[in-house]
Amino acid sequence: YDNNVNGTLRLISAMRAANVKNFIFSSSATVYGDQPKIPYVESFPTGTPQSPYGKSKLMVEQILTDLQKAQPDWSIALLRYFNPVGAHPSGDMGEDPQGIPNNLMPYIAQVAVGRRDSLAIFGNDYPTEDGTGVRDYIHVMDLADGHVVAMEKLANKPGVHIYNLGAGVGSSVLDVVNAFSKACGKPVNYHFAPRREGDLPAYWADASKADRELNWRVTRTLDEMAQDTWHWQSRHPQGYPD
């Protein structure tokens, strides 16, 4: 809450002092909560996020929406991204979480590089094709491109502009494991564990609005996400130096 909510309030204060009125917020698909239909469309009402992270993102969306109502000359973009993965293709920058990773791709990468023995897959009895959870994975470079396009297209265009940034297709946990095994050239050890409370069986984006209005769409595949992650992790087996 301090990072997302208080940090945003401090940034808004600084922007008002500098007379800057274009704001791009990196929001999250978690603001949708549990929806009855997939894919998720921007017109869906926001739900009840399960995590403090999602709740803080929704709070910031509400703050920015109220700000724009009070000061209609502001241009605010709410970019709801789905599951960012991958790394910079140079292999110089990647995700290096401390402790056991919460996100799937770095967890797989640490198993593949030998830092962890096995990947825990939470649930193999979901109503999906292979029984594992399905998510919409997007390469971080596509996500970065989306922010740049939003900055260029929406600058000085008053209003609150909401866009999903996702691939528009779902991939299961085992799909991601198989893509990574192909990227690193060896099997990735995994085991099944009980479902985690609050995890949804499946969801993915309808990103057609971003395609239509921003001329943005993903260009990188799940295989490329795995390849770039492995490139980073294999060059930095222990992550970034302390």
Residue ranges and their predicted role:
Residues 32, 85, 169-171:
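Feature marks short, surface-exposed loop/turn motifs that line or immediately flank catalytic pockets
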